[in-house]
Amino acid sequence: MQVEAHLQKIIEKDGKVHLTLIDPASQTPDRAAEIALAAVEGGTDAIMIGGSTGASGTLLDETVIKIKENIHVPTILFPGSSAGLSKYADAVFFMSLLNSRDLGYVITNQVLGAPLVYRSQIEPISMAYLIVEPGGTVGWVGDAKLIPRKKPEIAAVYALAGKYLGMHYTYLEAGSGADSPVNPEMIGAVKQVLGENKLIVGGGIRNAETAKICTSAGADMIVTGTVVEEVKDVTAKVAEIVSAIKR
């Protein structure tokens, strides 16, 4: 089954999807595989692999290979640029950073990466990527014109544009390790215009309560990344969040 169809089946069954993000630059491939396995044991539905800096080349390939040896759930690339692609993954979030000032993140990296995706037959999942204040490292690297936290209507029209351009997913990103996640008002406004299209929310989600607030507001999928790198018991932390968001 294709990865996008697989995630849709999970939403139909459980109501929501949990994704764990692993940055290859943050640890060795072996450690990344350990984290991925622990997250899967906690109930995560797929492993996202990537980051805004340093996730490319041999390190990326070795990380994907090691993770796939350990787990049975899909691996999805989350590339910071065209260099963040690996033929060993199951799928890629083929995304455009719609609120970037730099055309490289809007379309040029996508043009450069498309031939590799085509040749390797990685499944592309089209996605509008939107960075919200505070934005963190990804906002700086991506030269994003950050969407103000208190302006949900701006996020909504960006998301609507992405939907009309044919993108299946929209990702609201507060930035890795953000002090607080995207607020519920913005999540709700975006989900309202997306309808059946899927909404992912990430950044600043460290516990079950926060994850539940995001899904109750309209998020279809939750991403946790920094927290799994920081806690000692990854399985317990992921299980806590998963149990809060799924029915």
From Swiss-Prot:
Keyword Magnesium recorded? yes
**Which GO MF term does the entry hold, naming one?**
phosphoglycerol geranylgeranyltransferase activity
Q: Name one GO cellular component term.
A: cytoplasm
**Where does the chain bind Mg(2+)?**
D23, S52
Localization:
Cytoplasm
EC number(s) per entry: 2.5.1.41
The chemistry this enzyme catalyses reads: sn-glycerol 1-phosphate + (2E,6E,10E)-geranylgeranyl diphosphate = sn-3-O-(geranylgeranyl)glycerol 1-phosphate + diphosphate
Please give a single GO biological process term from the UniProt record. Answer: glycerophospholipid biosynthetic process
UniProt keywords, alphabetically: Cytoplasm, Lipid biosynthesis, Lipid metabolism, Magnesium, Metal-binding, Phospholipid biosynthesis, Phospholipid metabolism, Transferase
Metabolic or biological pathway = Membrane lipid metabolism; glycerophospholipid metabolism
Annotated sn-glycerol 1-phosphate binding lies at Y171, L172, E173, A174, G175, S176, G177, G203, G204, G225, T226
Name the needed cofactors.
Mg(2+)
The UniProt family comment states: Belongs to the GGGP/HepGP synthase family. Group II subfamily.
What is its biological role?
Answer: Prenyltransferase that catalyzes the transfer of the geranylgeranyl moiety of geranylgeranyl diphosphate (GGPP) to the C3 hydroxyl of sn-glycerol-1-phosphate (G1P). This reaction is the first ether-bond-formation step in the biosynthesis of archaeal membrane lipids.
Question: Under which name does UniProt file this protein?
Answer: Geranylgeranylglyceryl phosphate synthase
